[in-house]
Amino acid sequence: GPADGQAVVVLLDTFGRWFVPENGEALIDVLAAAGCRVHVAGADDKRPLCCGRTFLAAGLIDEARHEARRLLLALKPFIEQKIPLVGLEPACILTLRDEYDVLLPASETKGLADMTFLLEEYLVKQSDVLSIRLEPTQYKQAALHCHCHQKAFATDHDVETVLNWIPELTVNPIASSCCGMAGDFGQWAKNYDVSMAMGELSLLPAVRALDPNTVVVGGGTSCRQQIHDGTGRDAVHFVQLLYQSMAHSAATRTGETGHS
């Protein structure tokens, strides 16, 4: 991004880093295109940072606390300068806002919660100062399913707001509860029947009934995996639609017909 742009630090979550790296790349590109000066959080020991959520979900509190402290050490210079932390994965990012205050002493987490945002929250909060130029994409209809953490923290409305910025795109939230995957819950053989039954309550039938040209937007990695496994439809993070819309916009402004 521009040297005089608003500084942000991106946290690439473990799931995104290894399974869908294109989402992290799109996040960086979208923020840079919006006029931000983007930093990527990293540790001195070169091992990728992790919020510790997977350890926490498994009851491994000491391991989760160790990862949390590694992350906070890397973020400390940014927190001290009040530089916002932005990420994509709801369970990971909102763990920093919610569980860290219980996991660690307040002296270690001071300032963290106030400077930590999911992408949708950050874009809505800063919409008056960011340079967000969007053009129509190939999609006219989007069906939206948000992660349970997004619903719990009411960021699902921000996702809908941001998607509605894309011209000629109609956004239809899917009336659904948990997809059933719930982190790694649905990955366990003993939970399979319960996991699929949860998905079949509303989400999976709704996705199967969609027009093939409707893009399915899923808020979390586990949500998108459950949708794929349960329906055969691929779901995308909304950052991909923003990236496409911004890329089209950039191409339009420069007279190009595409982008690399």
Regions found by a protein language model. Name each.
Residues G1-S260:
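Iron-sulfur cluster-binding electron-transfer modules in prokaryotic oxidoreductases
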